[in-house]
Amino acid sequence: MADQPKPISPLKNLLAGGFGGVCLVFVGHPLDTVKVRLQTQPPSLPGQPPMYSGTFDCFRKTLFREGITGLYRGMAAPIIGVTPMFAVCFFGFGLGKKLQQKHPEDVLSYPQLFAAGMLSGVFTTGIMTPGERIKCLLQIQASSGESKYTGTLDCAKKLYQEFGIRGIYKGTVLTLMRDVPASGMYFMTYEWLKNIFTPEGKRVSELSAPRILVAGGIAGIFNWAVAIPPDVLKSRFQTAPPGKYPNGFRDVLRELIRDEGVTSLYKGFNAVMIRAFPANAACFLGFEVAMKFLNWATPNL
């Protein structure tokens, strides 16, 4: 296996991880909106077509009815959360690696990298859950014709007033179920591909931008291949009226399989996979570029 990344300062981690996260959200949010609307659309009545027939139909209708701003609905919530979330994400991955090293020069196996990635998923849940909750509510209200919330802060304020802190953190368990294994797959795949793509005699840190894009994009696809079923459950649970699912994700899972079959757990699959490659390619390239710039501009930071 090729060389491990060198330790970086928390401030550099914050700045580079935040920049990578902003790149991810900006590139991927339109298809994330499509994904959430597909996952949360109500079952069609007998003899009537569904609200959206698929990814491209949802994209087309959203663009036609709401314009380009409709595709970026609810983006403020993930943008606000990405800087600390991605800083914590990369910090958690680095900490997970360090905890498994007996000596600083030890090279970790791929199962160890997977475990380190899982730790990053635990770290990010506290930031991710409220952002996802608000984002999903804002994304579906436009398609449903309701306008309960005027924006991100208004949504957070009303959730807290109505349900307290638990209302904002609704879906925490499902976020953990999604992000812990998916983050393990995410980082392990990225490190594996970086090692594969590194030419003979070169270091991983010298990998070209196109190869970073490909490694990051494929890592995103592997991440979402693991994350889609719990993500469907999370989206449905977080946007449901209070009290609809008293037993949590078990009730959501039971209802989905009963009413729509096992394939309902992969609602929005096309939108997710179309989004996964460019969004995560942008994330990792943004992170790597920011880190190189910071190491050049402020080597002692």
Curated annotation (Swiss-Prot):
Residues in compartment: Cytoplasmic: 2-12, 94-112, 191-211, 288-301
Stored InterPro entries: Mitochondrial_Carrier (IPR050567), Mitochondrial_sb/sol_carrier (IPR018108), Mt_carrier_dom_sf (IPR023395)
Cross-referenced SUPFAM superfamilies: Mitochondrial carrier
Subcellular localization: Mitochondrion inner membrane
Any single GO BP term: mitochondrial transport
Parts of the chain that traverse the membrane: 13-31, 74-93, 113-131, 171-190, 212-230, 268-287
PROSITE patterns, A to Z: SOLCAR
Recorded catalytic activity of this chain's protein: O-acetyl-(R)-carnitine(in) + (R)-carnitine(out) = O-acetyl-(R)-carnitine(out) + (R)-carnitine(in); an O-acyl-(R)-carnitine(in) + (R)-carnitine(out) = an O-acyl-(R)-carnitine(out) + (R)-carnitine(in); O-propanoyl-(R)-carnitine(in) + (R)-carnitine(out) = O-propanoyl-(R)-carnitine(out) + (R)-carnitine(in); O-hexadecanoyl-(R)-carnitine(in) + (R)-carnitine(out) = O-hexadecanoyl-(R)-carnitine(out) + (R)-carnitine(in)
Keywords of this entry: Acetylation, Disease variant, Lipid transport, Membrane, Mitochondrion, Mitochondrion inner membrane, Repeat, Transmembrane, Transmembrane helix, Transport
Positions of post-translational N6-acetyllysine modification: 148, 157, 170
GO MF annotation list: carnitine:O-acyl-L-carnitine antiporter activity; O-acyl-L-carnitine transmembrane transporter activity
PANTHER family noted in UniProt: MITOCHONDRIAL BASIC AMINO ACIDS TRANSPORTER-RELATED (PTHR45624), MITOCHONDRIAL CARNITINE_ACYLCARNITINE CARRIER PROTEIN (PTHR45624:SF56)
Known disease link: Carnitine-acylcarnitine translocase deficiency: A rare long-chain fatty acid oxidation disorder. Metabolic consequences include hypoketotic hypoglycemia under fasting conditions, hyperammonemia, elevated creatine kinase and transaminases, dicarboxylic aciduria, very low free carnitine and abnormal acylcarnitine profile with marked elevation of the long-chain acylcarnitines. Clinical features include neurologic abnormalities, cardiomyopathy, arrhythmias, skeletal muscle damage, liver dysfunction and episodes of life-threatening coma, which eventually lead to death.
Protein name: Mitochondrial carnitine/acylcarnitine carrier protein
Annotated organism of origin: Homo sapiens (Human)
Gene field: SLC25A20
